A protein has these predicted regions:
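Glycine-enriched, solvent-exposed interface loops adjoining structured elements
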Residues: 1-248
Length: 248
């Protein structure tokens, strides 16, 4: 098959079927052929696994959560993450109101240290993920936007409604990956799960994967000059919330 911007479930299944010597199908979802249905299953497993194999630019989204306390001096508060949230992109969390980066993720030990000592953090947003929620330490009484980038779990699209989703079920549903990644990974899974030697198929996939992750987005230039990161040993405990050496 030729490379296409949108490769459907039917195209992926038929490409894999043809490559392993199995007859193609005209309809995946209503097929009575167990081999075709298994290839479709392998394709969805491959798509899901690829979603967390790299920080794909086509799965990267920007979001904003309004952070506000329920009452003054609230110790911590949980906020809902986007429904398609899969994982944060590191170091993209900012408070748009103060134009300062948020500090996190705070580990469990430091979070409990802050809670037990009843430390009220008002100069910076501190955050962690717990029970699939975003938790903010000492949320402000006035709403402030917590901005971030994240990876979406929705690697596929409904072919009828164009709605993003996390699987392909209809013939015309399509995925967002380069076509060869899905075909080669699905093919490798076919060899593995059908009891054949899958080493060659996985080598084909790995070469394609290395290429695609290399060209997916521009790389950061490396330098030996000291960076612009924070020079603090521990940004949670080393910085007082008030005082700053002025007798406070």
């Amino acid at each position: 098959m030729s490379a296409a911007a949108q490769t459907t479930l039917l195209e992926v299944v038929n490409s894999v079927a043809q490559s392993v010597g199995h007859p193609k199908t005209t309809d995946v979802s209503s097929s009575q052929d167990e081999s075709i249905l298994r290839i479709a299953y392998y394709a969805n497993i491959a798509g899901t696994e690829l979603s967390y194999a790299a920080n794909w630019q086509w799965l990267t989204k920007v979001s904003e959560i309004q952070i506000v306390a329920d009452f003054p001096a609230q110790t911590e508060k949980a906020f809902d993450l986007p429904t398609d949230f899969h994982a944060f992109i590191d170091d993209t969390q900012w408070n748009r109101s103060t134009q300062l980066p948020a500090i996190g993720p705070i580990n469990s030990q430091d979070w409990q240290w802050l809670i037990v000592r009843k430390t009220m953090i008002t100069t910076r947003m501190m955050w962690r993920i717990r029970n699939k929620k975003l938790w903010i330490k000492s949320p402000p009484v006035n709403s402030q936007p917590f901005s971030f980038e994240y990876l979406s779990k929705n690697w596929a699209v409904d072919g009828n409604t164009e709605t993003p989703q996390d699987l392909m079920s209809k013939n015309i549903d399509y995925h967002l990956y380069p076509w060869q990644l899905m075909v080669l990974y699905t093919r490798a899974k076919w060899f593995e799960n059908e009891g054949y030697d899958s080493s060659g198929a996985y080598e084909d996939f790995k070469r394609a994967f290395m290429y695609e992750t290399g060209v997916d987005k521009a790389a950061t230039a490396l330098t030996l000059v000291p960076g612009q990161g924070y020079p603090y040993i521990d940004a949670v405990k080393n910085i007082p919330d008030t005082g700053y050496g002025f007798g406070g």
